[in-house]
Curated annotation (Swiss-Prot):
Gene from which this protein is expressed: KRTAP2-4
Region of interest called 10 X 5 AA repeats of C-C-[CDPQRW]-[ADPRS]-[CIPSTV], as start-end residue ranges on this chain: 5-112
Protein's name according to its UniProt entry: Keratin-associated protein 2-4
Assembly, per entry: Interacts with hair keratins.
Function: In the hair cortex, hair keratin intermediate filaments are embedded in an interfilamentous matrix, consisting of hair keratin-associated proteins (KRTAP), which are essential for the formation of a rigid and resistant hair shaft through their extensive disulfide bond cross-linking with abundant cysteine residues of hair keratins. The matrix proteins include the high-sulfur and high-glycine-tyrosine keratins.
Family listed: Belongs to the KRTAP type 2 family.
Tissue specificity comment: Expressed specifically in the middle/upper portions of the hair cortex, in the region termed the keratogenous zone.
Keyword vocabulary terms for this entry: Keratin, Repeat
Highest taxon of the lineage: Eukaryota
PANTHER family (alphabetical): KERATIN-ASSOCIATED PROTEIN 2-1
Pfam families: Keratin_B2, Keratin_B2_2
One GO cellular component term: cytosol
């Protein structure tokens, strides 16, 4: 799925649910169209300055997504192959394994390449 297909006769459906991602080959931090993903990744330093489109499956963004429901977050530099500097995240933090994730809450950030950082969450009293 590395060939250029956006704007050609090959639609995203012909890639088995994949989507065309306007992105630069040298810059993995980019924004995918909202219609083909579950997460909107908008790193501050990653401005779309693409010269050609590449196609990827619709999956979690490269630089983002501690919990799949958030926006405006970038992985720590130790995880990300590019120099992302956005560090304020809105991840789904978990107090215990039986807590339901809270997708909108006070900003917090993940430790590098690790588990979500402890945050204030609202947990269901019922079992998961």
């Amino acid at each position: 799925m590395t060939g250029s297909c956006c704007g050609s006769t090959l639609s995203s459906l012909s890639y088995g649910g994949g989507c065309c991602q306007p992105c630069c080959c040298r810059d993995p931090c980019c924004c995918r169209p909202v219609t083909c993903q579950t997460t909107v990744c908008r790193p501050v330093t990653c401005v779309p300055r693409c010269t050609r489109p590449i196609c990827e499956p619709c999956r979690r963004p490269v630089c983002c997504d501690p919990c799949s429901l958030q926006e405006g977050c970038c992985r720590p530099i130790t995880c990300c192959p590019s120099s992302c500097t956005a560090v304020v995240c809105r991840p789904c933090c978990w107090a215990t394994t039986c807590c339901q994730p809270v997708s909108v809450q006070s900003p917090c950030c993940r430790p590098p390449c690790g588990q979500p950082t402890p945050c204030s969450t609202t947990c269901r009293t019922s079992s998961c």
